[in-house]
Amino acid sequence: KKLKNSSKKFTFFYPGNINQKTGGYIYENNILKFSKKNKFPIKFIELTSNYPNPNIQDIKNLNKLTSNIKSDNILIFDGLVLEGLDKSTDIFDNFKIIALIHHPLYLEFKGKKSEFFFKRAVKIYKKINYFIVTSLSTKKLLSKTFHINSNKISIVEPGIEKFKIYKKTLSTKVKILSCGSIIERKKYDYLIKEVQNIENIQLHLVGDVSRESKYTSKIKKIISKNNLKSKVILHGKISQVKLEKLYSNCDFYISTSEYEGFGMALANAALSKLPIISYKTETIQKTIGKDGVLYFDNHNKDTLKNLIINNCFDNKKYKILKKNIKNKKYLTNDQSAKLFMKAIHNA
């Protein structure tokens, strides 16, 4: 069905470069492309990648931008930007606000830092008129933990399109792929330590290195200190073609993250018939199911190492895993973007 072009106008704020190949950016870039193609009235504005920790100048810039927007516009904030606005909540008083939450940020951290972001979210979420989330578990979390009326929350799952398949280059090494911003929540330090003493393995990490520069430095240090440059390849930002070639050339996809908003990269792996090793979470189980997946449920020393050694070097086991991957149905990019437009229009 054709989407009615709305008389409402929207301004969408997101942080950093939208062309990066990690879940949240792919999701938002899809909305941007769809809205341009269909002349849907959303203006996209790129803010600094400093969010969710903006400096004074960043806030001044945002205030300047919003002061030039008519008050009948509806503002859409990416969660990373939103949770950096605890000292500028007056922005929320002048406009109707929609928040796109991939997951609340307090889940990315432990201890005091987690508590800090949790309190921030409690304060900010109260001011929001409507929420869009990417999975049922995030909707449940917002309802239960933040006491948000579930009528104010829409689920719009991401579009997952089949990647182009390239000819696989033969290799004596088992190649493992993991995609996602280089941030603490992804637990790349644990992943590297678990694979560093396994022979004949190569780990490919794809993702934005600018989000948590301290953590990126930590990862680079682990790699150089242990002479792992040829074993752990840090790709940073790459093109779609290179990403598709990596999916075609790797043997397994791995995720060590304790929390995912949806798990787009894992869904891509499932569609690419790539066996998956993943930390067990409710969301991931819903996104990719259990066929062709090896789950683990703790980040203890040697848990992952043993799982890899016992499963990834046995051709018979590999073939069974690959054969078991079911054809899961995901939304296409257009279906996802259309649902997003419908949700903001009805918000």
Predicted segments with their positions:
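Membrane-proximal helix-turn-helix segments that form the acceptor-binding/catalytic region
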Residues: K112-F131
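Conserved donor-binding/catalytic core segment of Leloir-type glycosyltransferases
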Residues: I132, T169-K186, I192-I198, L203-V206
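Carbohydrate-associated surface elements
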Residues: S137, G159
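Nucleotide-activated donor-binding/catalytic signature segment of Leloir-type glycosyltransferases, i.e.
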Residues: T216-I238
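Short alpha-helical donor nucleotide-sugar binding micro-motif in glycosyltransferases
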Residues: K237-I238, K245-C250
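Aromatic "clamp/platform" in nucleotide-sugar-dependent glycosyltransferases that forms part
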Residues: E258
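Short hydrophobic beta-strand element within catalytic cores of glycosyltransferases
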Residues: P275-S278
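Conserved acidic donor-binding segment of nucleotide-sugar-dependent glycosyltransferases
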Residues: K290-D302, N310-K316
